[in-house]
């Protein structure tokens, strides 16, 4: 179950990070979802909306651009996952005008991009669970590997970035017993690249072969 806990970059007329639900409303969303065996994801840029979600027991935070130190510590304590799509601003700023995106959206993206990256680096240093996100609908899936290079640039090792896109992603979705690893009994699409991604993470931008 996903809900929009704060204003967004591509939300017309909203302030990025403005809290949109009361703590009581968020608690009801999380409690009902968990009671039915569903995980809860929240679209949240702003620090207050993030902390309300984490205190209610949300499972994953999407974006987490303006998360503060208290929010980082809550995520660490709760074992929550952060999905911080730190490549997206390059795509938004280069392709947004061609797609007719509003200047409001482009401006808001510029305002939060570096803050999100700085907070991603802090999260890496704290050992918080980070998974790769694509921001579906904003960023094309074919460019998803570009996120990995930025994750390395902002503090991860290449192996940590690859695991964020595979093993940790499966854990975030609750399917870690059947996916996320190349192991007996697991489902996986296996890719081949021309160079070792542990030496050059950009090699994952050019997939030579996919074995389903």
Q: Positions of the model-derived regions?
A:
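Small/polar (Gly/Ser/Thr/Ala-rich) solvent-exposed segments
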Residues: 199
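His/Asp/Glu-enriched, well-ordered alpha-helical/loop segment
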Residues: 35, 39, 100-104, 111-196
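Histidine/acidic residue-rich metal-binding segments in metalloenzymes
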Residues: 1-5, 9-82, 98, 110-130, ...
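Catalytic metal-binding/acid-base residues of hydrolase active sites
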Residues: 45, 87, 137
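Short aromatic-centered micro-motifs
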Residues: 210-212
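Residue-level marker of structural boundaries
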Residues: 10, 59, 91, 170-171, ...
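Short, small/polar residue-rich loop motifs at catalytic or cofactor-binding pockets
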Residues: 203-205
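Active-site loop ensemble at the mouth of alpha/beta enzyme cores that anchors a bound cofactor
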Residues: 81-85, 89-107
